A protein has these predicted regions:
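Cytosolic regulatory regions of ion transport systems
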Residues: 7-179
C-alpha cells in the first residue's frame, strides 16, 4: 500500500503535538467517543450534558463534565466558551436544540463550532447560523465506505473539500522496489 498524505501541509503540526481545548456538548455515543479520542490524544476536554445519567455513565472517560442545559445563555456564559479552541455540538436527536446551541456559541464568541446534522437541510441551516463545519455522519460514512468498498485499489478515502481528497491506494506491482 502506498499512503500519500498532505496533512503536514494542511494542518501544520500534525500528530496532536499541540494541545487544544475542546468543549463537547452532548455525551451520547458520538460525543463520548469524540471526547475519549481527544483526551487520549492529550487535549483538554470539558463536556456539557443535560442528563445526569449520561454524565455519570461517561465520568470514567471524560473527567470534566458540567451538568446543565446548553441552550441556557446564563449557564453557557459561565463556561467561558470563547476560551476554547473548538466547540462540538454532538447532539443529533433534536435539531432545534442543535441550532439554538450553535447560534448561542457564536453569540458567546466561540472560535470554531462544529455541529452535527442528520439531514442535508439541517446542514445548510447550521452553516448559515454559526457553524464553521457540519458533520453529517451517516452520509459521510456511507460515502467513504462506498468509495472504499466500491473500488479495488482504494483502501481508504477522506474528502477535504468537494474536489480534493486524500486516498490510500494500492501500490502497482511495477512500482515495487522503486523510490
Amino acid at each position: 500500500r502506498l499512503r500519500i498524505s498532505v496533512a503536514d501541509k494542511v494542518c501544520g503540526d500534525y500528530g496532536g503535538r499541540n494541545m487544544k481545548s475542546f468543549l463537547i456538548i452532548g455525551l451520547g455515543r458520538f460525543g463520548r467517543h469524540m471526547a475519549q479520542k481527544l483526551i487520549e490524544a492529550g487535549h483538554e476536554v470539558l463536556a456539557v450534558e443535560i442528563s445526569e445519567e449520561r454524565a455519570d455513565a461517561a465520568v470514567d472517560i471524560v473527567p470534566q463534565i458540567l451538568i446543565g442545559d446548553a441552550t441556557d445563555e446564563r449557564f453557557m456564559s459561565t463556561i467561558g466558551v470563547k476560551n476554547f479552541d473548538m466547540a462540538v455540538v454532538a447532539i443529533s436527536e433534536n435539531f432545534q436544540q442543535v441550532l439554538e446551541i450553535t447560534v448561542l456559541l457564536e453569540d458567546l464568541g466561540c472560535k470554531y463550532t462544529v455541529a452535527r446534522a442528520t439531514r442535508e437541510v439541517h446542514k445548510k441551516l447550521l452553516l448559515r447560523n454559526g457553524a464553521d463545519h457540519v458533520i453529517y455522519a451517516e452520509k459521510e460514512i456511507a460515502e467513504r465506505l462506498a468509495m472504499r468498498y466500491g473500488a479495488d485499489n482504494i483502501f481508504d478515502y477522506v474528502e477535504l473539500t468537494g474536489d480534493i481528497g486524500i486516498y490510500e491506494i494500492g501500490l502497482p506491482i511495477k512500482w515495487k522496489g522503486e523510490s
